[in-house]
Curated annotation (Swiss-Prot):
<dbReference type="InterPro" id="IPR004524">
    <property type="entry name" value="Asp-tRNA-ligase_1"/>
</dbReference>
<dbReference type="InterPro" id="IPR047089">
    <property type="entry name" value="Asp-tRNA-ligase_1_N"/>
</dbReference>
<comment type="subunit">
    <text>Homodimer.</text>
</comment>
<feature type="site" description="Important for tRNA non-discrimination">
    <location>
        <position position="33"/>
    </location>
</feature>
<dbReference type="GO" id="GO:0004815">
    <property type="term" value="F:aspartate-tRNA ligase activity"/>
</dbReference>
<dbReference type="InterPro" id="IPR029351">
    <property type="entry name" value="GAD_dom"/>
</dbReference>
<dbReference type="InterPro" id="IPR045864">
    <property type="entry name" value="aa-tRNA-synth_II/BPL/LPL"/>
</dbReference>
<dbReference type="InterPro" id="IPR004365">
    <property type="entry name" value="NA-bd_OB_tRNA"/>
</dbReference>
<dbReference type="Pfam" id="PF02938">
    <property type="entry name" value="GAD"/>
</dbReference>
<dbReference type="InterPro" id="IPR004115">
    <property type="entry name" value="GAD-like_sf"/>
</dbReference>
<keyword id="KW-0030">Aminoacyl-tRNA synthetase</keyword>
<keyword id="KW-0963">Cytoplasm</keyword>
<feature type="binding site">
    <location>
        <position position="488"/>
    </location>
    <ligand>
        <name>ATP</name>
    </ligand>
</feature>
<feature type="binding site">
    <location>
        <position position="175"/>
    </location>
    <ligand>
        <name>L-aspartate</name>
    </ligand>
</feature>
<keyword id="KW-0067">ATP-binding</keyword>
<dbReference type="Pfam" id="PF00152">
    <property type="entry name" value="tRNA-synt_2"/>
</dbReference>
<dbReference type="InterPro" id="IPR006195">
    <property type="entry name" value="aa-tRNA-synth_II"/>
</dbReference>
Length: 594
């Protein structure tokens, strides 16, 4: 017999009755039933009930066992009485009578319980992550992650992609976030950087003649944490292809993403990839107040400025006299009560706005009537025109925000999400995907008038050089994101592979040729030797697992995550270096004032 186990703790059933077996695992819980000791023995695969009575030669040793001790037992498999069968677990028809026991590892008093559903502070969970990971939900999440990555690899290989690895130590190349710098011992005063993404390397692969690349790539960014973002590192499905159009990239990655969500989505609806809408960045902001809209929510915002221009509602009427302003409506089907409207108005105030105007429609003495402060101020004719435009009726409401879109759009988008949630309009059993396209490359600083990059400067401008010779604010990039349920899941672009167009694109934003060559010299030089048209994208592994596991926090699907302050409480990182290390690197730490 094997030194530690003949079977796992999920393997035994009635067919093993009468056999002598060996199991190893952790004591999930201990129960004393009138002198009989029952232990739920747990390993990675499941739980088996083992037991001993006072006549057992090792009963005294078994009495000493406590939760989360690691033990090995030998015993005989016996069938449970019919009334004691536990149909919820694979081993529920049997139990093992212990004949021998060995304690493989004792446990101190537990700072958090593995058994049960009790919640613990995140600080405790991360400090004792090895205990937290023993819990069933966490084991399930990590196995899901492993299986999902395996499925992704298989799907990419099936499409003719090859997996190649890119460097983990490279040059600093600002890509929208801060770099993690690594000092060089051999070159004092100089630094490497951990890559924010394999972006330049994968493009250089295309220049090198490789046609289809992918990688499950680690990425390192010194970012502020969010619930859906790790503050230090994350993994992405990174891919690139030569001689492709934007639609080719969509047709390649969409079946991979859809297939993974169908395989691991536990029956939730996944729209067919050919049904995923392509929404312009401009329309996404207009309709949903976000470039990563949650399309499970059917609410679509609309511009209703004309109904308020010159109206009796002075706030909006005067606002519309200013250049670049508009009034936007958020329809709220079934939200037609004053209580709900007041609640949403309070939401807007918490978001930093003065409030949110509203109208709701109800049954009156003479039929349907509009109610709310706005309805009184603008009159029945304008109110009716708004209702008809929005397609609303009795029991419905509409909320209104105004100003320059950039000042209220994000809040409007969040309000749309809250309305969808509170009115049960958002379909929880669906993964709703949408391609966001036609991103503007440039934006103008309203105070300085300076033109700068708004989005990826390395995407090929739609229209090429001709577009760059026109109004920069009209230039759209061959850039795209894939949104799912309110999260950005994929981001990519058709790349700018022509040096002269790249130099021109950066020149518009105030970057000279020398600066571009200094910062991106490796890639720019390579493009002078016959670079092919190429494009690709990257999909966030952590976010995909988070959605599939139905978790709200990304740390629930990362094995050993940092906390919100970018600290590893378990490994005590970051830590102060030893003086010898600093001397070897030629570095000195300058004390910071508190």
């Amino acid at each position: 017999m094997h030194a530690f186990r003949s079977h796992t703790c999920a393997e035994l059933n009635k067919s093993h009755v009468g056999e002598t077996v060996r199991l190893s695992g952790w004591v999930h819980r201990v129960r004393d039933h009138g002198g009989l000791l029952f232990i739920d023995l747990r390993d990675h695969y499941g739980v088996t009930q083992v037991m001993a009575d006072p006549d057992s030669p090792v009963f005294a040793e078994i009495e000493k066992v406590r939760s989360e001790w690691c033990i090995r037992i030998d015993g005989e498999v016996k069938a449970r009485d019919e009334s004691l069968v536990n149909a919820k677990i694979p081993t529920g028809e049997i139990e093992v009578f212990i004949r021998d026991i060995e304690v493989l590892g004792k446990s101190e008093e537990l700072p958090l319980m593995v058994f049960g559903e009790q919640e613990y502070p995140e600080e405790t969970r991360l400090r004792y992550r090895y205990l937290d990971l023993r819990r069933e939900k966490m084991q399930r999440n990590m196995v899901l992650r492993s299986n999902m990555i395996r499925s992704i690899r298989n799907r990419m290989w099936d499409q003719g992609f090859n997996e190649y690895q890119t460097p983990i130590i490279t040059a600093s190349s600002p890509e929208g976030a801060r770099d993690f710098l690594v000092p060089s011992r051999l070159h004092p005063g100089k630094f490497y950087a951990l890559p924010q993404a394999p972006q330049q390397f994968k493009q250089l692969m295309m220049v090198s003649g490789f046609d289809k690349y992918f990688q499950i790539a680690p990425c390192f960014r010194d970012e502020d944490p969010r619930a859906d973002r790790s503050p230090t590192d994350f993994y992405q499905l990174d891919m690139e292809m030569s001689f492709v159009t934007q639609q080719d990239v969509f047709d390649t990655i969409a079946p991979v993403i859809a297939g993974v969500f169908e395989e691991f989505g536990q029956g939730r609806k996944v729209d067919a990839p050919n049904e995923w809408p392509q929404i312009s960045y401009k329309d996404a902001a207009l309709w949903y107040g976000s470039d990563k809209p949650d399309l499970r929510n059917p609410i679509k915002m609309q511009v209703v400025s004309e109904h308020f221009r010159g109206s009796g509602f002075a706030i909006f009427a005067k606002l519309l006299e200013q250049e670049g302003t508009e009034i936007r409506a958020i329809p709220a089907p079934t939200g037609g009560s004053r209580k709900f409207c007041d609640r949403m108005n309070a939401f807007a105030q918490k978001e930093g706005l003065p409030g949110m105007g509203y109208i709701f429609w109800r049954e009156g003495a003479d039929g349907m009537e509009a109610a709310g402060p706005l309805a009184k101020n603008i009159g029945p004719e304008r109110t009716e025109a708004i209702r008809q435009q929005l397609g609303l009726g009795v029991g419905d409401a509409a909320f209104f925000l105004g100003g320059k879109p950039k000042t209220f759009e994000a809040v409007a988008g969040r309000a749309r999400n809250v309305i969808g949630e509170e009115l049960n309009l958002t379909d929880k059993d669906r993964f709703a995907f949408a391609w966001i396209v036609d991103f503007p490359i440039y934006e103008k600083d309203e105070e300085t008038g300076k033109i700068d990059f708004e989005h990826n400067p390395f995407s090929m401008p739609q229209g090429g050089m001709d577009a760059l010779n026109g109004d920069p604010l009209d230039v759209r990039g061959n850039q795209y994101d894939l949104a799912c349920n309110g999260y950005e899941l994929v981001s990519g672009a058709i790349r700018n592979h022509k040096p002269e167009i790249m130099f021109k694109a950066f020149e518009i934003a105030g970057y000279g040729k020398e600066e571009v060559e200094k910062r991106f010299g490796g890639m720019v030089n390579a493009f002078q030797y016959g670079a092919p048209p190429h494009g690709g994208c990257a999909a966030g592994i952590d976010r995909m697992v988070m959605l599939l596991a139905d978790e709200a926090n990304i740390r629930e699907v990362i094995m050993f995550p940092m906390n919100q302050r970018a600290e590893d409480l378990m490994m005590a990182a970051p830590s102060e270096p030893m003086s010898e290390q600093l001397m070897e690197l030629g570095l000195r730490v300058i004390p910071q004032d508190d």
